[in-house]
């Protein structure tokens, strides 16, 4: 009987943990504008799993259909959009504010765990070379990097 209780408790905790992970992923995906189609989550971490205001960086795969539209339309893909995306001040890369490392560290400093593979290198490369786009509000930043097939969302607060 004691063993069944322990196994049941552990199973319940595991299911609860998986639920929190899925809810967290869904929550941060909701900040990506609707007309930017994203695929799998390449990297995600944030303070307190979205329970309170925190700091985090989330990297998603950019799907080919959006990549081709961005490649064709350029900056107008973002500036001509309605809703959330059209209201942001989108700028093309290279990011002039990232010429000094202390500036970019601010937006990516929430990365608390090791970034898999060469993902950080791809983000830095995309931000420092032409072909990508970025926008920011006081607490949120988006980078769309078609050449790297990445969408980066970071938040503070």
Regions found by a protein language model. Give the residues of each.
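General helical structural elements
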Residues: 7-8, 104
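Positively charged n-region of N-terminal signal peptides that target proteins for export
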Residues: 1-4
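Functional cores of ribonucleases/endoribonucleases
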Residues: 77-148, 157
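Secondary-structure transition/turn motif
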Residues: 64, 155-157
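N-terminal export/targeting and maturation segments
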Residues: 10-83, 87
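Amphipathic alpha-helical dimerization/oligomerization modules
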Residues: 150-152
């Amino acid at each position: 009987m004691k063993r069944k209780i322990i196994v049941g408790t552990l199973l319940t905790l595991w299911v609860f943990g998986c639920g929190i992970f899925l809810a967290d992923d869904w929550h941060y995906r909701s900040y990506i504008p609707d007309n930017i189609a994203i695929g799998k989550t390449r990297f995600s971490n944030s303070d307190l799993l979205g329970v309170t205001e925190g700091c985090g960086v989330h990297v998603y795969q950019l799907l080919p259909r959006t990549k081709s539209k961005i490649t064709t339309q350029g900056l107008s893909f973002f500036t001509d959009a309605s809703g959330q995306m059209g209201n942001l001040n989108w700028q093309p890369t290279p990011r002039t504010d990232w010429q000094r490392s202390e500036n970019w560290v601010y937006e990516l400093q929430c990365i608390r765990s090791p970034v898999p593979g060469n993902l950080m290198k791809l983000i830095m490369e995309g931000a420092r070379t032409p072909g990508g786009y970025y926008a920011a509000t006081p607490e949120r930043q988006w980078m769309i990097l078609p050449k790297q097939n990445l969408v980066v969302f970071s938040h503070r607060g």
